[in-house]
Regions:
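C-terminal juxtamembrane segment of a hydrophobic transmembrane alpha-helix
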Residues: 8-40
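N-terminal export/assembly leader peptides and their processing motifs that target proteins to secretory
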Residues: 27-157
């Protein structure tokens, strides 16, 4: 009789422990799987995103224009968060450009909303006189989307 009681108590303890483990781990596994799914969506979007700088040129020492095409299969959102840079090809001069009209080195575009597949967008670059482009020098224009896909174009002023 004692063995039956001990066995019953051990079975009850085992079932209770298993229930506690399942109750504790289920939410953790659910959160983890959601994180993996979200991460996979981000990676898929990045894989489908691609751009190409079609042309970049300077009209004078303080003004340049660049055209960038969305050649990927995904629309690009939040274009205002893109990163644009001009640097000397040898790396001795680096000019980061900021979106907007209130900074010295800036870029603007007329594009609003999503940048769709196959669309080419024009970017107007304004450079402060202290960072002005030098005649006869070769420059590298770099463009990076908000999710890190980048393209570059070499031009001479």
């Amino acid at each position: 009789m004692d063995k039956i009681i001990v066995t019953a108590l051990l079975v009850i303890a085992g079932v209770t422990a298993a229930a506690l483990v399942v109750t504790t781990l289920t939410p953790i596994i659910g959160k983890s799987s959601r994180s993996v799914v979200d991460s996979q969506k981000d990676v898929a979007t990045r894989i489908q995103t691609d751009i190409k700088v079609i042309k970049a040129h300077a009209s004078d020492a303080e003004n340049a224009t660049a055209w960038v095409k969305n050649i990927g299969n995904a629309n690009i959102d939040f274009i205002h968060l893109s990163d644009l840079f001009i640097s000397l090809e040898d790396g001795t001069k680096f000019i980061p450009l900021t979106n907007g009209t209130s900074t010295d080195n800036r870029w603007t575009t007329d594009k609003d909303g999503s940048w769709t597949k196959g669309e080419t967008v024009k970017f107007v670059l304004s450079i402060d006189s202290g960072d002005a482009l030098e005649t006869g020098k070769t420059y590298l224009f770099s463009f990076s989307t908000p999710n890190g896909v980048a393209s570059e174009y070499i031009f001479t002023y």
